Amino acid sequence: MRIFLTGTMRAFYMLGFAAMASRILPVVFAALLAAPAGAQTLLRISTPAVPDDWHVKMLYVLRDDLAKSAPGRFEVQVHHSGTLFRQGAEVVAMQRGNLEMALLSMQDIARQLPEYSIFTAGYLIRDPAHLRKVWGGPIGDEARRRIAQEMGIELLQVVYLGTRELGLREPRPVKTPADLAGLKLRMPGSKEWLFLGQALGASATPLAFTEVYLGLKTGTIDAQDNPLPTLKSAKFYEVTKQIVLTGHLVDSLQLSISAKTWGALPASDRDAVKKAAAAAAKYNDDNRAREEKELIEFFRGQGIAVGTPDVEAFRKTVQAAYLKSEYAQKWPRGLLERINAVK
């Protein structure tokens, strides 16, 4: 090295650039000394959520947290509105190494591991607090290990999506599933969704989301089910006179990272990602819970009757229907009872 530098400096002097060399070489050496110890990790995150959704906003919380805790270690790219991968395609993209992170639904996971369809069943999860306790305890640990081993995907944090409630075009007394007999309840068109509608005691009717508003207005359907924020954003409340807080599906997403990406990270970077994911999930969960509470008062202000039925009666009826179904045959023995026992 000394000979090379001496030769180089001699060449500079011979060309009359001694002064230039004295300025350039210190800069070069300083740059080499300042270079990061490892390469920057690219984290592309895919979600179908739109920019105003808390799920997108939480991903920027994750990005900003990593920028502070691990400066220069990550390049986080948030791809919202399904612009990078369409909803449902993220799992395969992660497994093929084409995507680092995503917000995955349990429906996505259950397509490859059918036993986890249990997490898509009605009245499995009681509320957001129960959701966090289930996934924060042994049940969640077991699921994460199996999903990582079988699918090559690490689940970092469970994220609250929303609680589905019933919105009726005309008011009626609703306390138990028997009170929904004959009610034309719009559900998404898959057999799993229609099964849930029937289990609630209603006459489940498939209808495209874009047709729900007109269906409620004209009486093609009597009711629909969605989280409260959707009732507002889709303006369903304009053609709704009663909201029944059945809470029949406390839905969630999993903030996930590919096992390949995770395995390549040093321990310090893993810790940074875990902490950033926890901060992002808390940001989302707190804001969604607040929004749902505020919306109840908003709907009441619109003249809509909002009430709570006998939720335990609904839970027992729906869970009994699931236990007799083809879906329950794929659930791990005893898992339903373990989830119900989490307090």
Regions found by a protein language model. Name each.
Residues 35-39:
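Sec/Tat signal peptide C-region and signal peptidase I cleavage site
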Residues 15-34:
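Bacterial N-terminal signal peptides
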Residues 40-131, 139, 146-343:
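N-terminal secretory/targeting leader peptides
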Residues 3, 32, 134-136, 339-340:
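Short, Φ-rich (hydrophobic/aromatic) sequence segments
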Residues 1-21:
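N-terminal secretory signal peptides that target proteins for export/translocation
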